[in-house]
Regions:
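Active-site beta3 strand of CheY-like receiver
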Residues: 45-51, 56
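Short hydrophobic/Thr-rich beta-strand motif most characteristic of the beta2 strand and flanking loop
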Residues: 26-33, 41
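The feature encodes the CheY-like receiver
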Residues: 15, 57, 87, 106
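C-terminal output helix
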Residues: 107-117
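Conserved acidic carboxylate
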Residues: 9
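Charged docking surfaces used in two-component/phosphorelay signaling
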Residues: 16-24
């Protein structure tokens, strides 16, 4: 596995935090901030994992998630969804749309890294050998 993440997020502080956390573990992190073109970015970049914010400019993360799950080539893609709200209805909507993992901001470095490793199917030994 190439260990590529596409981070679809519009908050610079969150982008830098996730890039820092994952790059130290050998992940290549590319970013995209516009909801309207996010599905095209996933198709173009072909990541192993997508980290998707709920609140984005021009299109919600829920709509992007539904669009991706509706496409055969992305139906099995690992998608981690982030939200600052953390309400049960958000988690329920994400699960109904086919999210792989749901995480609330703020998150710890270890929470993010463990979630991404789990979605990638990496155990601790493989991740540390990276």
């Amino acid at each position: 596995m190439g260990k590529r993440v596409l981070l679809i997020e519009d908050e610079p502080n969150i982008i830098e935090a996730i890039r820092f956390i994952l790059s130290r573990d050998g992940w290549t992190v590319e970013t995209h901030s516009d909801g309207a073109t996010a599905v095209a970015a996933v198709a173009a970049k072909r990541p192993d994992i997508v980290i998707l914010d709920v609140m984005l400019p021009n299109k919600s993360g829920f709509d992007i998630l539904r669009d991706l799950r509706g496409m055969a080539e992305h139906s099995e893609l690992s998608i981690l969804m982030l939200t600052a709200r953390g309400q049960k209805k958000d988690r329920d909507m994400a699960e109904a749309a086919g999210v792989s993992h749901f995480m609330t901001k703020p998150f710890s470095n270890s929470e993010m890294l463990e979630a991404v490793r789990r979605l990638a199917g990496l155990d601790r030994a493989q991740a540390n050998d990276g």
